[in-house]
């Protein structure tokens, strides 16, 4: 089966969020399972540097100007790059400039991405043509619209990684991006008078997936639907919306082979985790005390991630003898709040503003509990990494967090499926109650080890996701 993923990021070459991790791992897992899978991306500078042995597949004039389509390989996966320097060769992130302003021509930059994916489905590369075009998030949403406009030369799947980002643009651009004017309709890609690239994907895709079963249900409700809940509820009733969990790449996230750790360990030999904890306490200026549980945050510092609740609950956490480590960047108010907490509680709170992939591994290896109290979480990767490292996740029961973490209730402990802690209501009191329960388990080291081993034995591999996507593709074909 020939599958083309369409997206804007690829780990480890270019990453602004979890989307890059997904596209960096899923195609390789699909290839290992026997599918002929390739990826299409804009030729952003970091991607051009990392893709080797480039060949020119096509040269063409488009509504966005002159474009070359290049082909190369990365980590055994075939990669198409859309080389249009005037659109993609810029400093800053793929989406905004160094002053954090969205590029004014994003409508054109990502329309071109969708258009080229459709051209590949129509035979632009004479040596390879996809049977399924799998588009990811709003950046690739127009793939589904162009395919619909061209008579659906390939089946289309659209995956929602985060419904909050919708790709909204002025209606006057419809003519320039060369889609039928009839598509600008409430039964199409119109959303409150604007073009929505996200809605284009949701409306025109043959099938929509979310990155967890619970999130697929949540986005049919007003609380999580961002105005798309009506369309998504219809897709659910039609059998055209489902949830498939993301996975973990064991080549990157495996404590038994992770060279970024001070000491390697596995679920059968956990003692070396103590050395990672000691090194983390040293690195973050915490009191060296193996009896004090380290709670960690590795996240964008935003209210969506529930990190204002962590600040509210922090006094209670520290009173019980816990320590807190924070790695992340985001809202200025939250950054200042955590920095102030570190200044007020030396030896108990350590904060590093910014994101460092290597240091996130050290935190996973050294912390005891990872905090993920998100108000909503489509899938979440942090808790999956934590499970692999025996760092018990403490999560709010929403989205993918609900699908991947089993609370340490008496029933789950008895059934041998407990893997962390969860709470329902999005407030500091509920979070603090879950923290208190984690201290109860911490006071029983043998039981804590038992739950660690349960967590580390859970299978959230990309092989499982690859099989689920293959089953979906086959149903469409």
Curated annotation (Swiss-Prot):
It is an enzyme of class 2 (transferase). ADP-alpha-D-glucose binds at residue 15. GO terms for molecular function: alpha-1,4-glucan glucosyltransferase (ADP-glucose donor) activity; alpha-1,4-glucan glucosyltransferase (UDP-glucose donor) activity. One of its GO terms (cellular component) is cytosol. Gene3D superfamilies: Glycogen Phosphorylase B (3.40.50.2000). Its EC number is 2.4.1.21. One of its GO terms (biological process) is glycogen biosynthetic process. SUPFAM superfamilies: UDP-Glycosyltransferase/glycogen phosphorylase. It catalyses: [(1->4)-alpha-D-glucosyl](n) + ADP-alpha-D-glucose = [(1->4)-alpha-D-glucosyl](n+1) + ADP + H(+). Keywords: Glycogen biosynthesis, Glycosyltransferase, Transferase. Pathway: Glycan biosynthesis; glycogen biosynthesis. Belongs to the glycosyltransferase 1 family. Bacterial/plant glycogen synthase subfamily. HAMAP family: Glycogen_synth. Synthesizes alpha-1,4-glucan chains using ADP-glucose. NCBIfam families: glgA, PRK00654.1-2. This is Glycogen synthase. The gene is glgA.
């Amino acid at each position: 089966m020939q599958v083309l993923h369409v997206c804007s990021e690829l780990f480890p070459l270019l990453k602004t969020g979890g989307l890059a991790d997904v596209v960096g791992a899923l195609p390789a897992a699909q290839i290992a399972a026997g599918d002929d899978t390739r990826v299409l991306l804009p030729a952003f500078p970091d991607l051009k540097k990392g893709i080797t042995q480039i060949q020119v597949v096509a040269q063409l004039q488009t509504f966005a100007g002159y474009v070359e389509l290049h082909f190369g390989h990365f980590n055994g996966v075939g990669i198409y790059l859309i080389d249009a320097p005037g659109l993609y060769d810029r400093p800053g992130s793929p989406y905004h400039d160094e002053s954090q302003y969205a590029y004014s021509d994003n409508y054109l930059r990502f329309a071109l991405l969708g258009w080229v994916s459709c051209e590949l489905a129509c035979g632009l590369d004479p040596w390879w043509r996809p049977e399924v075009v799998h588009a990811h998030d709003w950046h690739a949403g127009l793939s589904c619209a162009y395919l619909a406009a061209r008579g659906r030369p390939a089946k289309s799947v659209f995956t929602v990684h985060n419904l909050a980002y919708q790709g909204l643009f002025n209606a006057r651009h419809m003519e320039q991006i060369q889609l039928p004017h009839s598509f600008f309709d409430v039964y199409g890609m119109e959303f409150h008078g604007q073009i929505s690239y996200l809605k284009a994907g949701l409306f025109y895709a043959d099938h929509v997936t979310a990155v967890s079963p619970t999130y697929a249900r949540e986005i049919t409700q007003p609380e999580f639907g961002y105005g798309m809940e009506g369309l998504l509820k219809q897709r659910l009733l039609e059998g055209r919306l489902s949830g498939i969990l993301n996975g973990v790449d064991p080549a990157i996230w495996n404590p038994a082979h992770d060279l970024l750790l001070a000491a390697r360990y596995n679920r059968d030999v956990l003692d070396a985790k103590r050395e990672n904890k000691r090194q983390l306490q040293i690195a973050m200026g915490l009191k060296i005390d193996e009896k004090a549980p380290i709670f960690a945050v590795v996240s964008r510092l935003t209210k969506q991630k529930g990190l204002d609740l962590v600040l509210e609950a922090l006094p209670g956490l520290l009173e019980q003898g816990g320590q807190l480590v924070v790695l992340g960047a985001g809202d200025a108010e939250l950054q200042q709040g955590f920095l102030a907490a570190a200044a007020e509680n030396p030896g108990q709170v350590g904060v590093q503003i910014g994101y460092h992939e290597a240091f996130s591994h050290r935190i996973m290896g050294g912390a005891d509990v990872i905090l993920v109290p998100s108000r909503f979480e489509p899938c979440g990767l942090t808790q999956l990494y934590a499970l692999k490292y025996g760092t018990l996740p403490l999560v709010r029961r929403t989205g993918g967090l609900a699908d991947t973490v089993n609370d340490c209730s008496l029933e789950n402990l008895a059934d041998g499926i407990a893997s962390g802690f969860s709470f329902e209501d999005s407030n500091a009191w509920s979070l603090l109650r879950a923290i208190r329960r984690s201290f109860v388990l911490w006071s029983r080291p043998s039981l804590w080890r038992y739950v660690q081993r349960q967590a580390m034995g859970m299978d959230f591999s990309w092989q499982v996701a690859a099989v689920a996507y293959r089953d979906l593709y086959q149903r469409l074909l």
